[in-house]
Amino acid sequence: MNGVIVGKLDGKVAVITGATSGMALAGAKLFVDEGAHVFITGRRKDELDQAVELIGRNVTGVQGDSADLDDLDRLFDTVKREKGAIDVLWASAGTGEPRRHHEITEEHFDAAFGLNARGTLFTVQKALPLFNDGGSIIMTGSNASQRGYPGWSVYAASKAVQQGYARVWAAELKDRGIRVNVLTPGQVATAKQEELFDEATKRQFESLIPRGKMGRAEEIATVALFLASDDSSYVNGIELVADGGTTAI
């Protein structure tokens, strides 16, 4: 043995959308630590630049909105020009704001479905021509589509479609050996959570979690690494829930 430690994604090329904060940023850092070159996206240039600086190496930032097909074309043109192929795609860009049924507007509906459903679909579609056979596609779901949290109907519905995507695409891509799975987190302590929920609401959420606490972004990142790597070589077409047991009881 030569003592060289090989990372789980050594030499791989990964694309992670919406990776300027939270779980996806933690995942990008972990993927790089495990040997990948990672392309990350974000809508705001200042946040994207900060994320690239934080990751520090083997990372390319591409500004863009995953709901904008022109931006997606520019993303994958950059990947093709710089690396030529993709091994891992984590379609993590998403959006959601709470609205009770009587508060839902067309704009609210279109924003959620435009990014979470439409954006995810076209992200995967436009990535596939660059995919190496045997690669891994991960989509970020939400346990809101299973738990029925009041006020989250549009968000829950826009995330539930990804389970259908995963099942069908796993079948469609079987001849290329490309796996497609959904990573579904529950409540995770991120800046977005701080923005959306007050302390009382967060304590209420924590009371529903058998693990007794919100997850950390780094904990979800390790699940993404599992799905991205050969550790999950026989895992395909599923929804892997990492929510501390919330949906299990």
Language-model features: locations:
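Conserved glycine-rich cofactor-binding loop
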Residues: 13, 20-21
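Short, small/polar-rich loop/turn modules that mediate ligand/substrate recognition or access, typified
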Residues: 90, 174, 179, 235-237
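Substrate-binding pocket helix/loop in short-chain dehydrogenase/reductase
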Residues: 100-101, 105-113, 193, 205
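Active-site helix of classical SDR
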Residues: 124, 158, 166
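Alpha-helical segment proximal to the catalytic Tyr-Lys
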Residues: 129, 171-175, 233
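C-terminal substrate-recognition "lid" of short-chain dehydrogenase/reductases
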Residues: 130, 214-242, 247-248
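Residue(s) in the substrate-gating loop at a strand-loop-helix junction
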Residues: 142
